Amino acid sequence: MSERKKRGSSDADSRRGVAIISPPKRRSQRKSASDSPIPAPIMKRSITVKKIMPRKTLAAIANTGSQFTPKVSNVTAAPRRSSRISPKIQKENAFSEQSQMDPKDVTSQSSAPEIDVLSPIPVNIQLSPKLDNRDMIMSQKVRRSYSRLEMSLNSSAFLYSPTRKTDSSDTSTPNAVLKSSRISLFGFDKLLNSEMPEGELKKSSAVTREKTANERNLQTVLPEEPDHNIPGVVLAKQKRRKRKVPVLEKSDVDEWAAIMNAEFDEAEKFDLTVE
C-alpha cells in the first residue's frame, strides 16, 4: 500500500509542474524551409509578337491610295487553323449564328480599334503589268486533261489490226480492238512502207551496214579522248611512253628466209606412203 501511495504522489507532483526532461524533437525539412529567407519575386517581361502583313493586302492598300503607316503594337499570336476545318462562311448554319448575334455586340465589335501590323515590305509596290484581253481569255480557259488518253494508252485502246479497214490508228481517238494486235504508230507506219524498189532498198541497207561496221572498228581501235574543255577541272597530261620495237637487220631476215625455204623444200620432197 505504501508503494502505491508513493507512486500516486509522484504522479501528482508531475502534474503540478515538475519539469520532466524529454529528448529534443526532430524538425522536418518542410517546416524548416519555411523559416529560410523568402527569395526575391521573379520579374516577368512582356513579349511583343509581330505579324507580317501579306503582299496581297499591301498591294490592295497601294491601289486604293490610302496612306498606311505601320506601327508596332502588342499582338497576341492567333492559333493556326488546320485546312480540314472549314471557316464559318462555308457552314450551313453560319447565317443562323450571325442572325442570333445582338446588334449591341456588332456595334461593339465594329467600334474596336484596328490593330496596326508591322511589315518589312514597303508600301509603294510596283504592280504587275495588266493582262491583255487575249491573256485574260486564255487564263479563264480550262486546262485540258490527259487522264483519259493515258488510261487508253495503258489499256488496249490504241491497238489496231492492219486488216481492219475502218481503223483510225493515226488519230488520238482510241479504237476498241483485240489485244493480240500491235500498237499503232499514229500514222507514222506509212513511212515504213516506202515506195523505193527492192534493189535500191537492199543497196542502201548494205551501205548503212558497212558504215556501222567501220564506225565500230574505229571505236575499238582508237581510244576515246577525254574532254579537256571542262570548266573548273584541270586534267593532268598523261605521258605515254613509246614502245621500243627491235629493229631487225636485213642480213638476219635473209638468213631466216633461207632456213624456212629449205624446210619447205624438204617437206615437199618427203613421200608419205599409206598402207
Swiss-Prot record:
UniProt's post-translational modification comment states: Ubiquitinated by the APC/C complex in G1, leading to its degradation.
Q: Does the keyword Ubl conjugation apply?
A: yes
The main location class comes to nucleus
Where does the motif KEN box lie?
91-93
Task: Give the top-rank taxon of the lineage listed in the UniProt record for this protein.
Answer: Eukaryota
Motif FGF motif, residue numbers: 186-188
Bias class Basic and acidic residues marks the residues at 1-16
Which UniProt keywords are given for this protein, alphabetically ordered?
Cell cycle, Cell division, Chromosome, Cytoplasm, Mitosis, Nucleus, Ubl conjugation
Which parts of the sequence are annotated with region: Disordered? 1-42, 63-117
The answer to whether UniProt assigns keyword Nucleotide-binding to this entry is no
GO BP annotations, alphabetical order: cell division; double-strand break repair; mitotic metaphase chromosome alignment; mitotic sister chromatid cohesion; positive regulation of exit from mitosis
Polar residues bias (residue ranges):
63-76, 93-112
Localization recorded for this chain is:
Nucleus; Chromosome; Cytoplasm
Instruction: Show the segment(s) annotated as C-terminal Sororin domain.
Output: 253-275
One Pfam match, given by its short name, reads: Sororin_middle
- Record's subunit section: Interacts with the APC/C complex. Interacts with the chromatin-bound cohesin complex; the interaction is indirect, occurs after DNA replication and requires acetylation of the cohesin component smc3. Interacts (via the FGF motif) with pds5a and pds5b; the interaction is direct and prevents the interaction of pds5a with wapl.
Functional note: Regulator of sister chromatid cohesion in mitosis stabilizing cohesin complex association with chromatin. May antagonize the action of wapl which stimulates cohesin dissociation from chromatin. Cohesion ensures that chromosome partitioning is accurate in both meiotic and mitotic cells and plays an important role in DNA repair. Required for efficient DNA double-stranded break repair.
About its domains, the entry says: The KEN box is required for the association with the APC/C complex.
Per the record, the similarity remark reads:
Belongs to the sororin family.
Under what name is this protein listed? Sororin-B
Q: Which organism is it from?
A: Xenopus laevis (African clawed frog)
> Gene of origin?
cdca5-b
